[in-house]
Amino acid sequence: MRKTLLLLAATVACTFSVQAQKTYTLASPDGRLQTTVAAGDALTYAVTFDGRTILDASPLSLTLDNGTTWGADPRVAGVTRTSADKTIASPFYRADSIRDHYNALTLRMKGDWSVEFRAYDDGVAYRFVSRAKKPFNIVSEQADFRFPADLEATVPYVARGKEGDFDDQFYNSFENTYTTARLSELNPGRLMFLPLVVDAGDGVKVCITETDLENYPGLYLTNAGAAKNGLKGVFAPYPEKQEQGGHNRLQMLVRERKDHIAKVDTPRAFPWRMAIVGSDTDLA
């Protein structure tokens, strides 16, 4: 009888676990790229290209100053799917217009926030969206990019600052030559700035970058550890105290920092995190 009860309890627990995690798929217009978003204990996304894994399940989250973490045990309240195929004028680009063609998936969560994913023929992107009407601070963001193997990456390290001291490295000129190494060989004591490229093999490259950056710190990356075969995001905390300095006293130098990375006063969308997929010539 006891064995029967234990077996029944285990079966119920497994069933609950399976039911608790919801998955949503989003394909690019040409169908070659597919993103799988999972909402279970954590919020993750994975990407395949022509059926081959490009990104393993990678967690994403925002932690607020009230202790809430958007992405931890997320509860989906609604799902919206849209598509777009329009033209954007680009008078200062190498072409006078750009085709904006994508499929989108928006997960509306309980708790005044959403996460939006877009799938293009040449990449995927996601961003958080706040519906909160009261001001709050963002303490931290988790932006991980986990790959299926110890792949080769070509990255620009921050050139100045003390080894292992990210706060010192935040003050930099975003200038350096690129270094090529396996993910596990990337220096965990130095920040990397964007864009950077990971070689997924068979001529496929993955370019990590961001866009729509406003009133928010820029994304740096660092080695996430060999076991994870990936990169994790690092963000500069909000300035507390600044003073004039630097070359010819032209810069404002941050001397002290607050315990959060961003202030949010009104409903808004946050920066896009992007994984562009293509060949070397596609990325040029």
Positions of PLM-derived features:
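Bacterial Sec-dependent N-terminal signal peptides
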Residues: 1-22
